[in-house]
């Protein structure tokens, strides 16, 4: 098989196999080919991984942030040196075009290692608090063993986004990738060892829905970081709460992207397409509710159709391909069910909605799809589809669109396109979301915090802010004189 790893799991610095686990077949979405066969972690494998992480963490935490950061920066260098190899693996794992993975996936992971490796000495600090004769100080200390649970849309990126802040803060990690995309995280673990990371600090275990509870409920786990759906998030949160564990969650969204009539039309359409079709629409922060002011609705839709129909769909390994297949048959079928629901509820299909003609019949392809005349109560305007389906809604004025944009249980992201920056800042202040863009969309450099509100989760990935979620504050009071007691 073309992408078979040495073994299913990576624990304590080496590959580990246990064929007693449930079989996981890694399928290349473009052709339906089985490219690797792995095994889900048994309870014994989970125990082995957590034991390794627990054993290795104290010595790692005793190292200086500079020393820890140096190893992460070396891992970033190795990832960049092997960007082509890692990008091709990511394409096999996910079906995303190589045109995309080579600029957005391993490189983003490398950015994370480099960023956190660089800021650790300055960011992992505390405060000095004078108290007259006495004084106090605070320091940030690691939590211990952290569990990362990844999603299938950006497997390598997520493995790094969770691993980098955890490791540089002095923690160890056990990472479980999605069973749909099991391959990339194993390579990340290999590279970290090559970069000099001590054994046991970054472990990868494969698994399905039954594996998560084994990790989350383990008494030696101090922290859980999840990227996934809202239903999964609720289950993980409930389990983690029973053990009073630290939790951060980046969950789903149904984000609004608002286009006012003074916006640059081409830029707004470009932003809407990035926010709906990149990664074949499988991005949690996508702006899938595109609100267009009525004055420009027809011109917006006409040009949007032209540009959408020109998207190149095909073999993900062809660098000319702009849109690849869905990650799995199950996900494609789910998206098709939403398309049918949109039609039946009265939305107007502008373009797409079917299977492209020029692709493998065994691939999980779907055309980029645009619906117009969508109303707020329609299913496709309320539920996260997680596929290349854009819903265009129209609006009259600012107050109306802000109220409608906020009328959702989600709060991950939002975007505003307008030439009036005063209005832009006023609108984003009123939008209920954690990550917002003005006159662009879906740009997430590691320097800025990323995360949501409401049912879209809590906590933040990236930026120095992320380190707060992988450390806790220790306060030390220093008495400088005799102790006075009333007895």
From Swiss-Prot:
Superkingdom assignment: Bacteria
SUPFAM superfamilies for this protein: ALDH-like
Active site, renumbered: 162, 250, 284, 461
The protein's Enzyme Commission number: 1.2.1.8
Positions that bind K(+) 1: 26-27, 93
Coiled coil feature spans: none
Pfam family, one: Aldedh
Reaction(s) the record says it catalyses: betaine aldehyde + NAD(+) + H2O = glycine betaine + NADH + 2 H(+)
PANTHER family per UniProt: ALDEHYDE DEHYDROGENASE-RELATED
Name of the molecule in the record: Betaine aldehyde dehydrogenase
Organism: Sinorhizobium medicae (strain WSM419)
